[in-house]
Amino acid sequence: MALKKFLEDIEHHFEPGGKHEKWFALYEAVATVFYTPGIVTNKSSHVRDSVDLKRIMIMVWFAVFPAMFWGMYNAGGQAIAALNHMYAGDQLATVISGNWHYWLTEMLGGTIAADAGVGSKMLLGATYFLPIYATVFLVGGFWEVLFCMVRKHEVNEGFFVTSILFALIVPPTLPLWQAALGITFGVVVAKEIFGGTGRNFLNPALAGRAFLFFAYPAQISGDVVWTAADGFSGATALSQWAQGGNGALVNTVTGSPITWMDAFIGNIPGSIGEVSTLALMIGAAMIVYMRIASWRIIAGVMIGMIAVSTLFNVIGSDTNPMFNMPWHWHLVLGGFAFGMFFMATDPVSASFTNKGKWWYGILIGAMCVMIRVVNPAYPEGMMLAILFANLFAPLFDHVVIEKNIKRRLARYGK
């Protein structure tokens, strides 16, 4: 109650005419994190619901926690396994002392030894993920608050989701300055220039990642960025399949084959939050149950992916192993599951109409497989498929609405 009274006592300073009027957006953002805003309608409302934009965004934020925690554990585990595979004794100690992530982990009570437990793996993974997330949150939050102050309206809570989604779809070794550049592009160019939350036609997190992919490909793709171990090089499972098919899927540290269950659980290198389809399904179940994410879009993505991957399986190829990848492997490799559950279902950049959502999802699933199979330079296709579908979402809605209008006119004889 003391906090609420304090906020109420200083509120008048941020209202129009107050000495801190220009900082109202920042005050409102902090106050509404803890308490419901006092703004009410002056007429009877048509729909009464305790869930507002802030609560919806917070639920999505919580929904990615399973993937986030597993991603930190997996990133730490992959790094520890690789380090102990390459180095031993004094050489390992030298490597640890030369990397602040490693020595910070040991200083906080963790260990980089081969027998490191869950806590040490989680701790090491956190030293990679949390700085990226903090950088993205602070830099992106700065731009969000700046635009809100200029436009004189409250801070939109959509950035809570954008920041964590962006941090989860990049490699654990991404330089912090590149993370800052990527989120700057996503927030400013893909969102704020078009009017802010609710007016952007591209997914800001994906737009930021696409910017980094084309501007700095060496730090966000290739074989050396996915495992946070100095001097280690290892391709992702999707890249391995693109090179040699199912038989080429091996753990780059132990040399043992990668099974479908390994990929489903997330015991493979990759972007921090994209590796575990199981963890992503848990989070997706939350937002689908709460009707935040559209099940029609998710079903459409699956239908498009299964149909096109099956078509390529039937066609076959002796020179391109990706033609032979079954749909259930497409599901668990790369960023497909993350994109399907948390990116494609973005309510702003996706289609609004029910029929439009089906076609929007089908286009994403089909395009993802086509890019993975046909494009020889880039085995991943989910990011580009969703951004491509974002451009078509308004067209799908326009066609559906026009057809509904014509159907109603014909029904009533006009």
UniProtKB/Swiss-Prot annotation:
Q: Which residues cross the membrane?
A: 56-76, 129-149, 164-184, 268-288, 297-317, 325-345, 358-378, 381-401
- Entry's Pfam families? NQR2_RnfD_RnfE
The compartments listed are: Cell inner membrane
- What is any one of the record's Gene Ontology cellular component terms? plasma membrane
- Reactions accelerated catalytically: a ubiquinone + n Na(+)(in) + NADH + H(+) = a ubiquinol + n Na(+)(out) + NAD(+)
Q: Transport as a keyword?
A: yes
Task: Quote the InterPro entries the UniProt record gives.
Answer: NqrB, NqrB/RnfD
EC number of the protein: 7.2.1.1
Keyword list (alphabetical) reads: Cell inner membrane, Cell membrane, Flavoprotein, FMN, Ion transport, Membrane, NAD, Phosphoprotein, Sodium, Sodium transport, Translocase, Transmembrane, Transmembrane helix, Transport, Ubiquinone
Subunit notes for this chain? Composed of six subunits; NqrA, NqrB, NqrC, NqrD, NqrE and NqrF.
Needed cofactors, names only, are: FMN
Protein topology in the membrane: Multi-pass membrane protein
- Main function: NQR complex catalyzes the reduction of ubiquinone-1 to ubiquinol by two successive reactions, coupled with the transport of Na(+) ions from the cytoplasm to the periplasm. NqrA to NqrE are probably involved in the second step, the conversion of ubisemiquinone to ubiquinol.
Return the similarity comment. Answer: Belongs to the NqrB/RnfD family.
- Protein name, UniProt field: Na(+)-translocating NADH-quinone reductase subunit B
At the highest ranks, the source species' classification is: Bacteria, Pseudomonadati, Pseudomonadota, Gammaproteobacteria, Vibrionales
Modification FMN phosphoryl threonine occurs at? T236
Activity regulation comment = This reaction is tightly coupled to the Na(+) pumping activity and specifically requires Na(+) for activity. Inhibited by korormicin and 2-N-heptyl-4-hydroxyquinoline N-oxide (HQNO).
What does the entry give for GO biological process? respiratory electron transport chain; sodium ion transport; transmembrane transport
GO molecular-function term, one example from the UniProt record: FMN binding
Task: Name the predominant localization.
Answer: membrane
